[in-house]
Amino acid sequence: MEKANPMYSSIYSQFPQYFGDQPWTAGPVYVGAFVMFLFVLGCFIVKGPLKWALLGATIFSVLLSWGKNFMGLTDFFIDYVPMYNKFRAVSSILVIAEFTIPLLAIFALKEILGRPEILKLKENRTGVIVSLVLTAGVSLVLAVAPSVFFSSFVTAQEMAALQQGLPAEHLTPVVTNLTEMRKAIIASDAWRSFFIIVVGCFLLFLYQQKKLKASFTMTLSLIHI
């Protein structure tokens, strides 16, 4: 909120920091930046059917959370899965992902602590690079250029409300300032996520180089998570 113009503070107090299409939503589902890195890495270094079950459940819960954006799957569950139509919000199904993502991340951490050399293996280098690109890389892009992923920072509903409640001469300054505020919020969160991932990876690197003990690394990683 550092970029907020004090002149319009009473207006901004009526809008949440979240600016998506979901009504009555204060923010997105959050599982942790370093957890996401370990989750993606786990897709490469964890072996066995449990990995595929956790990955499948994660993807499935995300698809179900799309609701009207994936009506075929949503309608099927509403029609054929008992009690599914009692959910007040389809996004509540993401509680599955909030369980499966950290669980696979923990399995990945277990593999690394049990076999420090696992990240040096040639077949796992691609996994490390992909994990960094999809987590730290995306966070860095969001931090430097938030506009890359968003065409607008003010929803159509918010714009309509502002047009009705503000004089024409104040509309453009308010929209511009609100846009800058939300860009700053995204950049701040993205920088934090980027540094969390970098610090977490550095801890794993130190453990791999035998500079840290397993118990100490696990403790720091769990705190980091």
Task: Indicate where each model-derived feature is located.
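Mixed-charge, polar/low-complexity N-terminal
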Residues: 9-11, 15-16, 43-44, 63, ...
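Contiguous transmembrane helix-bundle modules in multi-pass membrane proteins
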Residues: 46-223
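Hydrophobic, membrane-inserted alpha-helices
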Residues: 34-40, 199-203
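Individual transmembrane alpha-helix segments
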Residues: 1-38, 182-191
